[in-house]
């Protein structure tokens, strides 16, 4: 009886693990979506770290994070992007790259923040077609006359840092 139970348990284990492996490998659409999403996710994550460094008014950290952003941009495999993402990517990739290079090449906080304006515009255009899994908030500062993107609804202004940390408002929620 004990051997029968062990044999039955082994058979079920093999049956279910084979079925799971088959389901994972025979679903290329699921795999492609995961790859496409991850292609731009690293760009978005790096953008947010640049924004956070600007909030801290840390020009050296901002420069370093912009280098990480540049690495993420160059790592994107265009052939893995969804059609609508690819279309926008082709329109913004040169500007994204130039802005990331510009921010990484200086420790002048004023120049970094000025360049961040156009970096944010390009990132917004891209994230708008990416269907993020979590809400992204487009925020606006009237004093800087500039937008930026945030994962948090609470305003933390990258253009003025601690001197005007909460200046601005949410103008759009991207879902």
Q: What is the predicted role of each segment?
A:
Residues 1-27:
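Bacterial Sec-dependent N-terminal signal peptides
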Residues 31-175:
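Mature extracytoplasmic or organellar-lumen-exposed domains after removal of signal/transit peptides
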